[in-house]
């Protein structure tokens, strides 16, 4: 019986890019918070969201969940050498300010904060009013 000879495959370790300047995109909706850290061209370095960290249901929309997201994303991006960021905030959620503060507390220097929330020129009809 013939023996099966396996070829040895050499796997190279993925190169870590040393990126010093980047962008932080914080999307804070009524239901969740997503923090994405990118280089200046928009290529993702690291990201995190509330559901990924174990928050479920209505706890995903809290400022504390957004803070934990920002810390986790900053930690993964700082391994690539990220030091200075420009922050772009999108959405009406509760975790906007908490995420920015968490990025600063994690050791990233914030050089710019910009609100890029899309504002309709009377586009889609908004959801009906809640009656509680």
From Swiss-Prot:
<dbReference type="GO" id="GO:0005840">
    <property type="term" value="C:ribosome"/>
</dbReference>
<dbReference type="InterPro" id="IPR001971">
    <property type="entry name" value="Ribosomal_uS11"/>
</dbReference>
<dbReference type="Pfam" id="PF00411">
    <property type="entry name" value="Ribosomal_S11"/>
</dbReference>
<dbReference type="GO" id="GO:0019843">
    <property type="term" value="F:rRNA binding"/>
</dbReference>
<keyword id="KW-0694">RNA-binding</keyword>
<protein>
    <recommendedName>
        <fullName>Small ribosomal subunit protein uS11</fullName>
    </recommendedName>
</protein>
<comment type="function">
    <text>Located on the platform of the 30S subunit, it bridges several disparate RNA helices of the 16S rRNA. Forms part of the Shine-Dalgarno cleft in the 70S ribosome.</text>
</comment>
<dbReference type="GO" id="GO:1990904">
    <property type="term" value="C:ribonucleoprotein complex"/>
</dbReference>
<comment type="subunit">
    <text>Part of the 30S ribosomal subunit. Interacts with proteins S7 and S18. Binds to IF-3.</text>
</comment>
<keyword id="KW-0699">rRNA-binding</keyword>
<comment type="similarity">
    <text>Belongs to the universal ribosomal protein uS11 family.</text>
</comment>
<dbReference type="GO" id="GO:0003735">
    <property type="term" value="F:structural constituent of ribosome"/>
</dbReference>
<keyword id="KW-0689">Ribosomal protein</keyword>
<dbReference type="InterPro" id="IPR018102">
    <property type="entry name" value="Ribosomal_uS11_CS"/>
</dbReference>
<keyword id="KW-0687">Ribonucleoprotein</keyword>
<dbReference type="GO" id="GO:0006412">
    <property type="term" value="P:translation"/>
</dbReference>
<dbReference type="InterPro" id="IPR019981">
    <property type="entry name" value="Ribosomal_uS11_bac-type"/>
</dbReference>
<dbReference type="InterPro" id="IPR036967">
    <property type="entry name" value="Ribosomal_uS11_sf"/>
</dbReference>
């Amino acid at each position: 019986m013939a023996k099966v000879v396996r070829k040895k495959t050499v796997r190279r370790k993925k190169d870590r890019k040393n990126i010093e300047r980047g962008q932080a995109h914080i999307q804070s909706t009524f239901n969740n918070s997503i923090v994405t850290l990118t280089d200046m061209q928009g290529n993702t370095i690291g990201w995190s969201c509330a559901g990924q960290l174990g928050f479920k249901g209505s706890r995903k929309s809290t400022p504390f969940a957004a803070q934990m997201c920002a810390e986790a994303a900053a930690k993964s991006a700082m391994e690539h050498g990220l030091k200075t960021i420009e922050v772009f905030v999108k959405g009406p959620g509760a975790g906007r300010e908490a995420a920015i503060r968490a990025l600063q507390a994690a050791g990233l220097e914030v050089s710019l904060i910009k609100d890029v929330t899309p504002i309709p020129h009377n586009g889609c009809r908004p959801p009906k009013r809640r009656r509680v």
